[in-house]
């Protein structure tokens, strides 16, 4: 396993990659599992709760996630070719952050429940309902697979503020 560099919006080449639509994976192979293991190690190191493959420069439809609270045992989850089958009409607002938009958080409204289908680490197809933080996180990460960042859901003013804050934080570092 290896920690990979996380692409960020303040780098033009990184942003171009982050805006790419990720391609579906044909099968869960040992090579793909190695990528998922690297992604998980990278996410834990950052630290974060979710990471899409495109965020480490691999534009394929793969997500890793761990929603365990601090002090709880790790509970890694793997999502290959995830797709939303159904979404609730009711929305929930949640303050989101992103490893590719460092040091910036803002509220985004998303459906409060979604039903999704994906392949897991073993390549088995799973259908599952997500709600709460799980629903927020899976939708946020699935946006990455479409080349969409959480700040793209914000008004132009708030998006510009986010970019300015990220650039300022990078200069200070």
UniProtKB/Swiss-Prot annotation:
Catalytic reaction annotation: N-terminal N-formyl-L-methionyl-[peptide] + H2O = N-terminal L-methionyl-[peptide] + formate
The organism of origin for this protein: Caulobacter vibrioides (strain NA1000 / CB15N) (Caulobacter crescentus)
A Pfam family the protein falls into: Pep_deformylase
EC id: 3.5.1.88
Keywords per UniProt: Hydrolase, Iron, Metal-binding, Protein biosynthesis
Keyword Metal-binding among record annotations: yes
Example of a GO biological process term: translation
InterPro entries: Peptide_deformylase, Peptide_deformylase_sf
Keyword Protein biosynthesis: yes
Sequence similarity: Belongs to the polypeptide deformylase family.
Protein name: Peptide deformylase
Function, as annotated: Removes the formyl group from the N-terminal Met of newly synthesized proteins. Requires at least a dipeptide for an efficient rate of reaction. N-terminal L-methionine is a prerequisite for activity but the enzyme has broad specificity at other positions.
Enzyme class: hydrolase
Membrane spanning stretches: none
Gene Ontology terms for molecular function: metal ion binding; peptide deformylase activity
Superkingdom field: Bacteria
Active-site residues, Swiss-Prot/TrEMBL: 141
Cofactor note (record): Binds 1 Fe(2+) ion.
Cofactor list: Fe(2+)
Binding positions for Fe cation per the UniProt entry: 98, 140, 144
């Amino acid at each position: 396993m290896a920690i990979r560099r996380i692409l960020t919006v303040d780098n033009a080449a990184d942003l171009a990659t982050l805006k790419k639509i990720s391609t579906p994976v044909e099968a869960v192979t040992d090579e793909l599992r190695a990528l998922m293991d690297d992604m998980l190690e990278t996410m834990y190191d950052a630290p974060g709760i979710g990471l899409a493959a495109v965020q480490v420069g691999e534009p394929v439809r793969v997500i890793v996630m761990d929603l365990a609270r601090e002090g709880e045992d790790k509970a890694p989850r793997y999502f290959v070719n995830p797709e939303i089958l159904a979404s609730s009409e009711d929305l929930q607002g949640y303050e989101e952050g992103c490893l590719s938009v460092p040091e910036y958080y803002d509220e985004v409204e998303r459906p409060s429940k979604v039903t999704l289908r994906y392949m897991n680490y073993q390549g088995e197809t799973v259908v599952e309902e997500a709600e709460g933080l799980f629903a927020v996180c899976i939708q946020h990460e699935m946006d990455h697979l479409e080349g969409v960042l959480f700040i793209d859901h914000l008004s132009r003013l708030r998006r510009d503020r986010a970019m300015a804050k990220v650039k300022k934080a990078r200069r200070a570092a």
